[in-house]
Amino acid sequence: MINKVLFMLVTFSFIFAETASINGKVQYEGKVPRAKKLNMAADPICGKAHTEPVFNESFLVNGDQFMENVIVWIDSPKHSSEVPSEPVVLDQVGCKYVPHVTGIMQGQELMIKNSDKTLHNIHSMSKVNSNFNFAMPAKSDPATKSFAKNEDPFYIKCDVHPWMKTWVVVLEHPYWAVTDADGNFSLDTDKLEPGTYDLCFWHEKWDKAMKGSGYCSDEYKTSVTIADKAVDAGTKIFKRPAKKK
């Protein structure tokens, strides 16, 4: 009897933990461009960090063309969430920024690490928040930064290694996610008020098109209604932006 009660409690807890969330996928429709190899010959330490070819991460899809590295966030949610105490970690590994794209809440710490045995330079290209530009030698202690204002996606680069780039979006809330290698995303909506919200989708290859039409314009958003349960947002399709006439 006791075992049965424990089983029911564990099962109930598992179901409860899975409830308040938004889940979905992102897929590309069109011809997939050939992946480009990165040339790291300028710094031998970078090349020696890899035993296999390294490819540009600006456009990654799997065999079914589900897209990796799409940032998904909720537009202007009604929430009571505090700034997370855990920092967002940005590392430099094998002369690449990890992760390639990320979100962060305004006021939340960004912890920057250098796991490489070479010098890097961290140069933010923000247009709203204060920029930073500093060197980070090998074996440096982590550096921490934060952003005081919301900001559309911008990139951070390394002036020493021009192929290194990571993208950041600064939000007034923690409700964001990045698609994985199979195009999946999941947003925990535990502290959101029930209602209908817009999900915004962003990818760096569409950045110029989005600036023209506006971030979170009709083409790059999906409306979802949430409650105390898991919500399937379906599959968001990205098509190649039409060329301007």
Outline where the language-model segments fall.
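Extracytoplasmic copper-binding redox domains, predominantly the cupredoxin/blue-copper superfamily
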Residues: E18-K245
